Amino acid sequence: MNIDQIQAILPHRYPFLLVDRVVEVAPGEKIKAYKNVTANEEFFNGHFPGNPVMPGVLIVEAMAQAVAILAMKSNGEVDMAGKVIYLAGVDNARFRKPVRPGDRLDIEGTVVKRKGPLWKLHAVATVDGEKVAEAELMATLAKK
């Protein structure tokens, strides 16, 4: 999925759209996506001057946006009019290595379980094949 297709699903826009491309999506199962982290990211101005590091909460947000795409695609195109996926919870978030300008943040998300409008998902973020973060995410489907 290119950026136009992503924007047709997610309500986020610059500077808060944190998924640049979806490489693979298997509805009801998994997603692979990425964010190109550039030196032009606004958050690097203050986090941290002279030692730029992507904030962990934004890594979690990037993972949440990727799994939101997975949930939306899993629910079916017809059912999505007027609906959005909201982040409902984050558990067991772990950050292993810093993400810096020039990195490509690869995200893999999998469905753990679904009950009605509530989704439990697992997401892992890597850079150059090394795990930088992971979390269990809860999401809920709701009206806009």
Predicted features along the sequence, with ranges:
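Helix-adjacent hinge/juxtasegments
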Residues: 47, 51-79
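Beta-strand-rich interaction surfaces with strong enrichment in secreted/lumenal proteins
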Residues: 7, 50, 95-97
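A residue-level signal for conserved active-site and pocket-lining positions in enzyme catalytic cores
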Residues: 22, 63, 109, 129
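Catalytic strand-loop segment that frames the active site of acyl-thioester-processing enzymes
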Residues: 14-54, 59
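Hydrophobic beta-strand-centered segment that forms part of the acyl-chain substrate-binding groove
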Residues: 67-106, 132, 140
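HotDog/MaoC-like acyl-thioester-processing domains
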Residues: 11, 27, 72, 99-103, ...
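Short aromatic-glycine motifs in intrinsically disordered, low-complexity regions
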Residues: 1-13, 80-81
